[in-house]
A protein has these predicted regions:
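N-terminal entry elements of small recognition
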Residues: 128-132
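A contiguous, low-structure linker/loop signature
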Residues: 89-127
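Active-site loop segments of alpha/beta catalytic cores
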Residues: 1-53, 57, 71, 75, ...
């Protein structure tokens, strides 16, 4: 493609992405899920079978940036109807690490988990308040910022950079307390409501600061920012999530989690909230979320063991009647079913096709 043709294509994408955020009927964008090779640290953990506690000193930023540079060498700027955005080491549970949890690498599991911090529950609020006021001194926060600074210098002129995978306030508090402990406390609100709300509020505020720091380090791309899916927007543009929703009832979700999703979404110009298909019909209260916040779009990740696409269609269409919708498929069966319904969606849709890549390194980039 000539330089002129490439520029025309990129300009056309910017306009298509504006249509997406406006939920314009008939806007169907498509992209393909990259393989695990696009996350070199995940590949390294797998190849070297790295197991056990993972500390900041073990993350060699110089090597990581060089590995990311080589992973994207020869990649096109475009991924279907989106831009190829690049996050920094999404295998790392960054938010959990920043708030003081212990990280553990799972070797052939090609992932990491976070275990509770060595902090008494009664001291957690003070710990988080101090952290919020002194984030720049946190070793993981500095590691993340330095990583994005270096990545911007190496690839920022070629690709848009996007913030890394960041889990939600409930996920963060669950990691601090232990997930069973968190839910148990939710079930006894008389004793725990104020305590939990303070922790959730502080974690939401920390999320906002960490996300904004990354966007500042990545700098603008075509006078805007790209999110996790390569969707451009003319303003601060983030992805939010809350996998802790899998452990709670609709009542607990509304009482404890939804207010802080609203707080996060309202802190940015554009935001898309990630939901799992197994819980989108009953737990995630996207209706109230949509009414009470500035949330820009919703994403539904079609879990391999979740409901069939046909069983979800009524919900997907209802969501799309309110907001732009992002759909991520993981199987060929889901892919065929979604494509059959492209003409049924009332608003704008971004569809991520499953990768056809095979082999040990074709594990899907985790978005949980």
């Amino acid at each position: 493609m000539s330089d002129e043709g490439r520029l025309d294509k990129e300009t056309g994408l910017l306009q298509s992405h504006r249509h997406f955020w406006n939920n314009s009927p008939g806007t169907v964008l498509r992209r393909t899920q990259l393989t695990g090779n696009s996350d070199p640290l995940r590949v390294h953990i797998y190849d070297e079978n790295i197991k056990g506690e993972f500390t900041p000193e073990m993350l060699d930023l110089e090597k990581l940036i060089d590995d990311i540079k080589h992973a994207y060498q020869g990649h096109s700027l475009l991924n279907g109807d989106t831009f190829q955005s690049i996050p920094l080491a999404p295998v790392v549970p960054w938010m959990e690490a920043i708030i003081g949890c212990h990280l553990y690498s799972l070797g052939r599991g090609a992932s990491m988990v976070a275990n509770p911090a060595d902090i008494e529950p009664g001291d957690l609020a003070q710990h988080l308040r101090h952290l919020l006021d002194n984030l720049s001194e946190n070793v993981w926060f500095k590691k993340l910022g330095d990583g994005y600074q270096a990545l911007a210098e190496v690839l920022g002129a070629k690709f848009p950079l996007t913030h890394t995978l960041m889990r939600g306030p409930g996920d963060m508090v669950g990691a601090l307390l232990g997930h069973e402990n968190l839910v148990g406390r939710m079930l006894k609100p008389a004793d725990n409501k104020d305590f939990l709300n303070e922790l959730l509020d502080l974690c939401a505020k920390i999320y906002i600061k960490v996300a904004k720091m990354q966007l500042e380090r990545t700098k603008e791309f075509k006078e805007g920012y790209c999110n996790w899916w390569g969707l451009w927007a003319p303003g601060l543009n983030v992805r939010t999530q809350e996998d802790e929703a899998a452990f709670v009832s609709p009542k607990l979700y509304n009482e404890f989690l939804l207010p802080y999703h609203i707080q996060e979404a309202d802190a940015f110009d554009y935001s898309a909230f990630h939901m799992h298909s197994g819980y989108v019909r009953l737990i995630y209260n996207w209706r109230d979320f949509s009414k009470k916040s500035n949330i820009s779009a919703f994403e539904v990740a079609l879990d391999p063991s979740g409901p069939a696409v046909e069983d979800l269609m009524e919900t997907l269409l209802e969501i799309n009647s309110e907001k732009p919708l992002i759909i991520d498929a993981t199987t060929d069966e889901q892919d065929k079913a979604i494509k059959k319904h492209f003409g049924d969606f009332p608003g704008s849709v971004l569809y991520t096709e499953p990768s056809s890549a095979q082999g040990l390194l074709s594990f899907k980039q985790q978005e949980t």
